[in-house]
Amino acid sequence: MRRALIFLASPHFFAPNFFIFIYAKRISTPQIPLFIRPQGFFQTNPKVASQLYATVQQWVKILPINHLWDLFCGVGGFGLHCAKALQDQGKPVTLTGIEISAAAIESATQSAQKLALNNVTFASLDAAQFALKDRQQTPELVIVNPPRRGIGKDLAEFLNQLNIPYLIYSSCNAESMVKDFAYLTHYQLHRVQLFDMFPHTTHYETVTLLIRK
C-alpha cells in the first residue's frame, strides 16, 4: 500500500517561507520527505509519483554505481530516492541535482538534510548548460526528467560522448522522448514502464532505463 498526502492553495495564501510537506509512506522503500514551495515543480499526481520513484529506486539499487546526476531534478524526487537506497546498501554515493527553479532546489536541499545524506549537492542551474560544462567527474548514471520539449539534440549527443553506463529517462511526452532516443545512438532501451499520471486524459508518464551499447 502506498500513500501520499498533499495540500494545495493559492500561492498568495502562504507566507514567503511557507512550504507544503509531502510524506510518502511506501512498502519496501525508505520514507522520503519531499517539500514543495509554490514556485517549485512536483509531479501532479503524488500517489502515482510515489510509485514512479519507487520503481526507479528498485531499478537503480542493483546497478554498480556510486556517482549520479539528476538533471531537471525538480524537488529531487528521483535522485533522493536513488541516493538513499544506494547509501542504505553501504555504498559511497555522490549525487548532483540540477534544476532551474531556485525554490525547487531549496526544497531538494531540505529533503537531503532531513535524510542525512552525505555528498549531495543541489544547484539552481540550467540542466543542459551544467551537463555540457561540468566535466570534472563523470557519473555512472544520469537521470533526466525534462519538460515536454525533451532534452534536445545537444544534450543527447553530449551524453553519448560522456561514456555514461546508464541513463534513466522519464517523460510526460512520449513524442519528444522518441526524438531524443533517435539522438541517443550509443544507448539501447533496457526497461520501460508507463504510469497513469494524468487519469481521464490521453497523457501519461513513461520511465525508461537505457544501457550503453
From Swiss-Prot:
InterPro entries: MeTrfase_TrmA_AS, MeTrfase_TrmA_CS, SAM-dependent_MTases_sf, U5_MeTrfase_fam. S-adenosyl-L-methionine binds at residues 43, 72, 99, 145. It catalyses: uridine(747) in 23S rRNA + S-adenosyl-L-methionine = 5-methyluridine(747) in 23S rRNA + S-adenosyl-L-homocysteine + H(+). The keyword Methyltransferase applies. CDD domains: AdoMet_MTases. The keyword rRNA processing applies. One of its GO terms (molecular function) is rRNA (uridine-C5-)-methyltransferase activity. It is an enzyme of class 2 (transferase). GO terms for biological process: rRNA base methylation. Keywords: Methyltransferase, rRNA processing, S-adenosyl-L-methionine, Transferase. It holds the Pfam family tRNA_U5-meth_tr. The active site is at residue 172. Its EC number is 2.1.1.189. Catalyzes the formation of 5-methyl-uridine at position 747 (m5U747) in 23S rRNA. Belongs to the class I-like SAM-binding methyltransferase superfamily. RNA M5U methyltransferase family. RlmC subfamily. This is Putative 23S rRNA (uracil(747)-C(5))-methyltransferase RlmC. The gene is rlmC.
